[in-house]
């Protein structure tokens, strides 16, 4: 059984021997939040696709605005859960339990840092390059004798943004300090939705850390008392706060995708209202209709409905977490919080997901971005991987010289060189990736 006193630690990854209490008003977890907000990888999220093409005449969500909204919802979830837990466990009043809102909020900011350009099509382009594309050749022993281990190969064929985020936050890149972002152990553990290695990824290609960061996660998990479920391959029970980060993400992406689809006229006003009203009881729906007689601006009505649904889902997910606290602490809770909410909102949420799949994610604009992104990422990967596996070629060196010095592109280890390419490409914005693709293909030249 995990316990709250051990689960919430202010110890910083990479600075364990230097840990000391700071004389300032900010808590260590608020420092995590601020450190993320001011980081370059976080800023780059403003030019990474969430779902819809960027930018357009109608401003829609990108990865940055999405992450900020998830952090806001995550803070509310964390604060509500902390308040209830302190009433339930008054002996924890002097612990870090009141900081749950700050921890979840910081973890929410970081949850998408590892996503490559062009949304999920970028992730798919990377994994399929190795499983189906020209990267397949790397599974075999190379002419110079280099060979990837089975676990390294699993990492590549199941490339996952969540695992990549953990790498960005913890890996010591060239010329950078030990511990990556040097975040607290608890914030780091709270972003790992799938706390197991890639060999357990299965058909959904979900896992929490690459083999290169396995020992880092093991260190964090041991410190926080996460339950070890399997040694080889490595698998732990989730940190309890992961459920709150996941719930905040589930709430936001579903609500914001619907709102964006409405703004882009993929969904009509009536369709949007119907989707959102379905979350509420008949009595509450009647109250909302009366409110709309006063607030007759349609956009304001949709925004009010959206915020009301978010409030409802926060209360529901908080209730589910508290109802199942013991299962969560024992590592036996299965599924997500959103899947355990009350019947009416659960049915409305399920219907929202179905509409999103059928009408939003399959809309022409969304598919066009996915197709273009897949092509761009695949091409960049093909050229860059060829460069690091055949560096003796003249053209290879030209490509290698483009890569930032923080990436270990000249490592003597094949896996590390491939990872350096993935670090470089996954860190690109949509615009940077497109610009590089055009230049490499001779479709664009630098202005003189």
Give the label of every model feature segment.
Residues 252, 256, 260, 314-326, ...:
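Hydrophobic alpha-helix feature that most strongly marks membrane-spanning transmembrane helices
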Residues 1-25, 37-48, 57, 68, ...:
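Sequence-structural signature of the catalytic-core scaffold of metal-dependent phosphohydrolases
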Residues 48-58, 355-360:
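A short small-residue
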Residues 61-64:
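Low-complexity, highly charged intrinsically disordered N-terminal segments
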Residues 322-404:
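Substrate-recognition/cap regions that form aromatic- and gly/pro-loop-enriched pockets
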Residues 66, 118, 122, 161, ...:
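Hydrophobic (often cysteine-bearing) scaffold residues that line and stabilize catalytic clefts
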Residues 30-43, 341-345:
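Acidic, low-complexity proline/glycine-rich segments
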Residues 390, 394-445:
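C-terminal amphipathic alpha-helical interaction region
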């Amino acid at each position: 059984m995990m316990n709250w006193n051990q689960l919430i630690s202010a110890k910083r990854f990479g600075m364990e021997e230097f840990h000391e209490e700071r004389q300032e008003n900010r808590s260590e977890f608020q420092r995590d939040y601020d450190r993320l907000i001011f980081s370059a990888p976080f800023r780059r999220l403003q030019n990474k696709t969430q779902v819809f093409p960027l930018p357009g005449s109608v401003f829609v969500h990108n990865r940055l605005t999405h992450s900020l909204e998830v952090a806001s919802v995550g803070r509310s979830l964390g604060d509500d859960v902390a308040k209830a837990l302190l009433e339930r466990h008054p002996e924890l009043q002097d612990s870090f339990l009141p900081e749950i809102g700050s921890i979840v909020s910081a973890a929410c900011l970081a949850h998408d840092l590892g996503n490559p350009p062009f949304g999920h099509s970028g992730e798919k382009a990377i994994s399929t390059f190795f499983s189906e594309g020209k990267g397949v050749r790397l599974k075999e022993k190379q002419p110079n004798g280099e060979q990837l281990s089975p676990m390294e190969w699993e990492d590549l064929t199941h490339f996952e943004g969540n695992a990549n985020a953990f790498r960005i936050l913890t890996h010591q890149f060239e010329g950078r300090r030990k511990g990556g972002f040097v975040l607290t152990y608890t914030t780091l553990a709270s972003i790992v939705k799938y706390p197991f290695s890639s060999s357990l990824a299965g058909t959904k290609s979900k896992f929490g850390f690459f083999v290169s960061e396995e020992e880092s996660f093991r260190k964090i998990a041991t410190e926080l008392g996460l339950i070890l479920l399997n040694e080889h391959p490595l698998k732990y029970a989730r940190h309890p706060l992961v459920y709150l980060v996941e719930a905040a993400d589930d709430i936001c992406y579903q609500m914001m995708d619907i709102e964006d689809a409405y703004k882009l006229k993929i969904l009509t006003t009536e369709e949007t209202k119907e989707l959102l009203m379905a979350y509420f009881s008949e009595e509450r729906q009647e109250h909302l209709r009366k409110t709309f007689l006063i607030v007759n601006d349609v956009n304001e009505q949709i925004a009010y409905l959206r915020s009301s649904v978010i409030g409802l889902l926060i209360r529901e997910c908080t209730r589910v977490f508290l109802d199942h606290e013991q299962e969560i602490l024992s590592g036996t809770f299965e599924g997500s919080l959103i899947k355990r909410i009350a019947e009416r909102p659960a049915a409305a949420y399920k219907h929202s997901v179905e509409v999103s799949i059928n009408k939003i994610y399959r809309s022409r604009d969304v598919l066009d971005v996915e197709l273009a992104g897949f092509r761009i990422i695949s091409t960049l990967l093909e050229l860059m991987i060829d460069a690091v596996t055949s560096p003796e070629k003249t053209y290879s060196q030209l490509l290698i010289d483009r890569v930032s010095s923080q990436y270990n592109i000249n490592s003597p280890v094949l896996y590390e060189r491939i990872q350096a390419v993935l670090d470089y490409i996954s860190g690109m914005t949509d615009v940077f990736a497109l610009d590089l693709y055009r230049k490499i293909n001779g479709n664009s030249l630098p202005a003189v």
